[in-house]
Every structure is written in C-alpha cells, then in structure tokens.
Amino acid sequence: MSTTKVITGKVRFSYVNIFKSRAFQAGQDAKYSVCLLIPKEDKATIKKIKAAIDAAVQDGISSKWGGKKPANLKQPLRDGDAERADEAPEYEGMYFLNCNSIQKPGIVDKDLNEILDPDEVYSGCWGRASINFFPFNTNGNKGVGVGLNNIQKLKDDDRLGAARASAESDFGGDDFEDDEDF
C-alpha cells in the first residue's frame, strides 16, 4: 500500500512561518507554513515524494474528483530551476514544495530536543520535514496539497531573503549632534 506521508532527507527551509500561524490573504485561515527546497540530487527523497503524490492522486480519483484524474491537476512538486532561479538563486538545482497546517508543527533539533526559540529555525537553515500529501477540490481548483506535520533542524546556513541591517550599523557611523534647526 502506498503512503501519502513522507519524511524528507536534508532540505533547506524557506519562507519559514512555523512558530506563529499567518493568513496570507484577507479572509483566509491562519496557517503554519514552510517552503522546502529539495536538492535535485536527493533521488531517494524525490522518489518518496513522487510516490506519495501518486497515492494522493489515486485517493483523489476515488474521493474528490468523480472517478477520474482532472486534466489540469495542480501538482505540489515544482522545479526551482524552471520557476524561481532567475529571482532567487537558492532555488537553483532544487525542487520545492509549499507545506502548511492549521496545527502548529512539532519542532525539534538534531538530538530531538524541542525548539522553542523562533530565531533558531529560520529561512536558510537545513533540516528534515514530516509531510503528508492530500487531494483537494476547492472552488473549482483540483490538485494535491502538502500538509506540514513536523520539522527537525539539522544545520545552520546563511539566512535567505531580505536580511536587515541592525540599527547600530545603520546609524553608528554618523557624528550626529543636536541640531536646533529641527
């Protein structure tokens, strides 16, 4: 029997929202989410993901899509080289998946100790994820979604996204004196 649950190999986390749920559009339910960047050379993880997607599609055929596979089925596994590499170099050589959950995921370190500090797991660090694939049919959109179960942080790396300078570095070099012209 095929399973829709996958424990990934080592992946890079991007767009990390796992400590506080967030609604991405007005009127949507707040969810915990993360984008997983999966190295294309991790053939074992890719194989497990493709098998889980196939299992979710088979489930959808019988439970959501009226006995047949829709022609324009939305697929969760996307190619970073084809879709994002021009705007985000960290997507080069990667597949990516967007995962979310209404429930907060379990978050642990490599020794399985719970991580409570939101600064400890960030966009750019590496880890593993427990995810599940499911069919959906919402407002005419049909496809396979990805649920987020748990996160395990394994290693630090450079932060991704808009790194902000500290206030000290922004203002520390100026010799600013009180000016009565204000």
Model-derived features with residue positions:
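OB-fold ssDNA-binding interfaces and closely related basic DNA-contact patches used
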Residues: 1-96
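OB-fold/S1-family single-stranded nucleic acid-binding modules
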Residues: 139-158
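Short, flexible loop/turn elements at secondary-structure junctions
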Residues: 101-103, 133-135, 150-152
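Exposed beta-sheet edge/beta-hairpin loop segments within beta-rich domains
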Residues: 111-127, 134-144
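Acidic, gly/ser/pro-rich intrinsically disordered tails
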Residues: 1-5, 10, 157-182
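Beta-strand elements of well-folded, non-transmembrane domains
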Residues: 38-40, 133-135, 155
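A beta-strand/beta-hairpin structural motif
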Residues: 99-116
